[in-house]
Every structure is written in structure tokens, then in C-alpha cells.
Amino acid sequence: MKVLEGIVTAPNAKIAVVIARFNSFINESLLEGALDALKRIGQVKDENITLVRVPGAYELPLIARRLADSKKYDAIVALGTVIRGGTAHFEYVAGEASSGLGQVAMQAEIPVAFGVLTTENIEQAIERAGTKAGNKGAEAALVALEMVNLLAQIDKA
């Protein structure tokens, strides 16, 4: 039986990180985690990482699609935070960001790691950005690298 599993080291991978500015005080922690994971664990060279800032989580899919279509990147890491408020806005933004990023991955056939926090309150967001619940930015970066390696293995198999 042949078993394919990805690894998280990818020193030559070209990675785009797309980050929303809205809720930047949380997103910057996600970014720190993602960059640390890419460089320290994934051994990705600094010159192989491109950072793109967008206004909010709703804008992530369009920019991710443009980056994917450029064929310059092996994977995209999308980072942002959507916190539930008193209106339906949360559902629209969170749903469109999630659905849109998934569509980019499927249509462009490139890993798009979902590092967008969708939380009930600010406390949950802070916990997931590097305190009690780990750093979801770092986790998304490692998912991207593992998927790059797994797709390469499938192509060789």
C-alpha cells in the first residue's frame, strides 16, 4: 500500500500571504505566527514570501484569485478576523470569505489555507491569535506547506 503524506518543510516554496487590515490588532498576531511558521518550521526563504494587505476579510478571495492566476505562487495563506456583531453582517462576510477562498483553491488548483478567524466575540479571537488556543495563522501556514508537498507527491506518483 502506498501512503502519501505531506511534510511541512518547503524551503523553495513561493508563498503569498494575504491579510485583512480590519481587526488588524488581532490579524497582526496571526501574521506573526504565520511568518514564524513559514520561516522557522517550513524553512521558507524570506524572499519567497509575498505579503499583500487588503481592506477586510470580504476582499480576501478576489486578491487570492489574482495571486493564484499569476502562477507565481505555490500556495496562498489567507488571514483575517470576523467577529460576530448584532447584525447579519457577520454571516455575509464570514460566508463569502470562506466560500470564495474555497472556490479559488478548487478552480486554480492551488492550496489556499484558511487562516480567517470567525468568532463570537473578541476574547475568542484573541485566544486563537496566539494565546490559549494557539495561533491559527501559524496553523494555516503549516497547512499551506503540507498541501504544497502533498500535491507534489501526487503529481510524482
Swiss-Prot record:
Record-listed (2S)-2-hydroxy-3-oxobutyl phosphate binding positions: 86-87, 128
Active site positions: 89 (proton donor)
Catalytic activity, as annotated: (2S)-2-hydroxy-3-oxobutyl phosphate + 5-amino-6-(D-ribitylamino)uracil = 6,7-dimethyl-8-(1-D-ribityl)lumazine + phosphate + 2 H2O + H(+)
This protein's UniProt keywords: Riboflavin biosynthesis, Transferase
One GO CC term, this protein: cytosol
Functional pathway: Cofactor biosynthesis; riboflavin biosynthesis; riboflavin from 2-hydroxy-3-oxobutyl phosphate and 5-amino-6-(D-ribitylamino)uracil: step 1/2
GO biological process: riboflavin biosynthetic process
UniProt-listed Enzyme Commission number(s): 2.5.1.78
Binding site for 5-amino-6-(D-ribitylamino)uracil: 22, 57-59, 81-83, 114
Catalytic class of the enzyme: transferase
Cysteine pairings via disulfide bonds: none
InterPro entries from the UniProt entry: LS, LS/RS, LS/RS_sf
Organism domain of life: Bacteria
Role noted for this protein: Catalyzes the formation of 6,7-dimethyl-8-ribityllumazine by condensation of 5-amino-6-(D-ribitylamino)uracil with 3,4-dihydroxy-2-butanone 4-phosphate. This is the penultimate step in the biosynthesis of riboflavin.
Subunit structure: Forms an icosahedral capsid composed of 60 subunits, arranged as a dodecamer of pentamers.
Protein name, entry field: 6,7-dimethyl-8-ribityllumazine synthase
The organism of origin for this protein: Histophilus somni (strain 2336) (Haemophilus somnus)
